[in-house]
Swiss-Prot record:
It holds the Pfam family PfkB. Pathway: Nucleotide-sugar biosynthesis; ADP-L-glycero-beta-D-manno-heptose biosynthesis; ADP-L-glycero-beta-D-manno-heptose from D-glycero-beta-D-manno-heptose 7-phosphate: step 1/4; Nucleotide-sugar biosynthesis; ADP-L-glycero-beta-D-manno-heptose biosynthesis; ADP-L-glycero-beta-D-manno-heptose from D-glycero-beta-D-manno-heptose 7-phosphate: step 3/4. Catalyzes the ADP transfer from ATP to D-glycero-beta-D-manno-heptose 1-phosphate, yielding ADP-D-glycero-beta-D-manno-heptose. The gene is hldE. PROSITE patterns: PFKB_KINASES_1 (PS00583). This is Bifunctional protein HldE. It is an enzyme of class 2 (transferase). Keywords: ATP-binding, Carbohydrate metabolism, Kinase, Multifunctional enzyme, Nucleotide-binding, Nucleotidyltransferase, Transferase.
Amino acid sequence: MKVTLPEFERAGVMVVGDVMLDRYWYGPTSRISPEAPVPVVKVDTIEERPGGAANVAMNIASLGAHSRLVGLTGIDDAARALSKTLADVNVKCDFVSVPTHPTITKLRVLSRNQQLIRLDFEEGFEGVDPEPMHERIAQALGSIGALVLSDYAKGALASVQQMIQLARKAGVPVLIDPKGTEFERYRGATLLTPNLSEFEAVAGKCKNEEEIVERGMKIIADFDFSALLVTRSEQGMTLLQPGKPPLHMPTQAQEVYDVTGAGDTVIGVLAATLAAGNSLEEACYFANAAAGVVVGKLGTSTVSPIELENAVRGRADTGFGVMREDELKVAVAAARKRGEKVVMTNGVFDILHAGHVSYLANARKLGDRLIVAVNSDASTKRLKGETRPVNPLEQRMIVLGALEAVDWVVSFEEDTPQRLIAGILPDLLVKGGDYKPEQIAGSEEVWANGGDVMVLNFEDGCSTTNIIKKIQKDSQ
């Protein structure tokens, strides 16, 4: 199916809410402390990730939209770490610094994939003057297409009603990820996105979808919401709007590893899609697809445009099928971040036969992802002669992309893929035939980067040339 993503690059979104820094200390443990009956962790890895409203802003930026973040922080190392990390992913931070409070920080100590303890560094921001935040919102309303209020009940949204009214007067939709059961404080919001447990804490336990719809519509009327999106984990999402039939969307998740931060991804994609000019129904469709991707990752994560496009095509993973070179580089970087081994091969693949399929299947077994680089029509003609290719580039790439063994397909114009390989730098470069490894284009670059080069045998008796000769002979 042809998928057209929203024009995220022209979307502007402001996120206001409780920002926090998630810190992770990892290490092995092999003994019990002599001081107390607790394990001793030898910390060897430290990670810092934006959390809360900051993760929402990061999700919006990852789509290519203009993301601006407003929140309360202290004047400390955690605030500086947040600012730097977010600036690196193109989130514009406009924090209100509160010298009497620390930046909210959650430190987790983990060993052998188990969390041993969590330490929270925080003081509620209730009572802090909200006017500086109101000023930042008012200044931005003319340049944004959506306002997200991300509530973790830490005090940044103590004046949430004034924030909603500022946006409503400017005609800017307000999307809220709620906290707690006091939906009254969100009165007048455009869209509320509670998960099922948050929804039922207000509406009561629901036996079926009919009860969800009935009670959801009552909540919309009671609190003057324009719409309500109930996220229901493995049951997908339900969008409710006055005067319209409910829209039920089944989950698109293939595998669920971690639901951490999935709500941040949902509201981030919703806001960016609305700000790009799409309808609420379309925004929910893309948000549902994004949720299916992000729960397949460990920890709080974001979704790239490539991942989102492939998810709505029905293949919820990091980039599948035919790609441009720039898209492929992004997909490969994401795969490496997950620790996946990338294998790359190349060829003309003019008339796909059993030998090709067997070779590609064997290449795929050598790693986690397989890239197939394909000679363009002009490159093939120079290599094989004026009568080739039999099948044009687009058709060759589509057929290759449909193979289970192949993750990504990309084309190159040159006689050899050396430049392309040097730009991708796969972990393993594979070529079929009777080559020596040093004869393979791109081998020097791959070796220099610490990768490997391998030659695989083709299946005997299978060749495009022989197929063409047989066709010509049979037609005489």
